[in-house]
Amino acid sequence: NLNVVKSFPPIRVWGTIGFIAAMWFTNLTGNKASVNQFYFAGIASFILAGYALSLPKCPPSKQKGESKSIVQTFGLDAFKLLANYKMLLFFLSSLMLGAALQLTNMYGDTYLDFFKYFPKYADSFSVKYSTIIMSISQVSETLFILAIPFFLSKFGIKKVMLISMIAWVLRFGLLSFGNPTDGLWMIIVSCIVYGMAFDFFNISGSLFVNSNVPKENRASAQGLFMMMTNGFGAILGSSISGILIDKYF
């Protein structure tokens, strides 16, 4: 059996490396604000689908003679976890942090690019290559992913998640005071902090679910965790940020 805490991060880090490659490719080819990036993503998706279909079959484990209800088949039994106060608090935190994640993913690059409308910053490197600057966040993410086993063994999962929440405050605070020239260091530090903010909750959160949910419900619970962050959290974050931007910008 694999040690999930030690084995998962080195595998998960390759997703972030792909993220960085996509950001650099679209920026260096002049397509960071072009429809072409969607064509690139579509091609990459077809390649990924072909690779996925080539993988060995791995059917879900099922005991002989075992039957499942419709609720279990669709993974809806994971919602029973919300009756547990600890799990309810975790999933609500996932919802809020998912909203914050959506805000930085959707508007982080746009925010830095917006400085081009100010003559003082228009020709700065960080504005012309804003996507590359923001990709420092993902570079930081790769390093913190690999450091997760150490931090979990040193501080425990609760303290690691608390560090993540503090890091999110620093992320947005530094972005709000930074600028592309003399304040560039704040933006860069905010990108470095992002790695901690994201990994210490999202990756550690997956490990938290894995260690606190019975084996037969883990897949459904991981799906619920993903739905809270990238589903309901994404809807909440994109809706609120859209309203605020329309009102104040």
PLM feature spans:
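C-terminal ends and interior cores of transmembrane alpha-helices
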Residues: 167-181
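Pair of pore-lining "gating" transmembrane helices in MFS-fold secondary transporters
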Residues: 83-104, 192-193
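Symmetry-related core transmembrane helices of the 12-TM Major Facilitator Superfamily/SLC fold
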Residues: 37-54
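Loop-to-transmembrane helix entry/capping segments in MFS-fold secondary transporters
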Residues: 2-14, 127, 213-226
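Short amphipathic helix-loop junctions that connect adjacent transmembrane helices
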Residues: 106-130
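Juxtamembrane intracellular "pre-TM" segments in multi-pass secondary transporters
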Residues: 57-92, 117-122
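Helix-to-loop junctions at the C-terminal end of transmembrane segments
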Residues: 29-30, 143-157, 245-246
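Intracellular juxtamembrane helix-capping segments at the cytosolic ends
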Residues: 1-2, 200-214
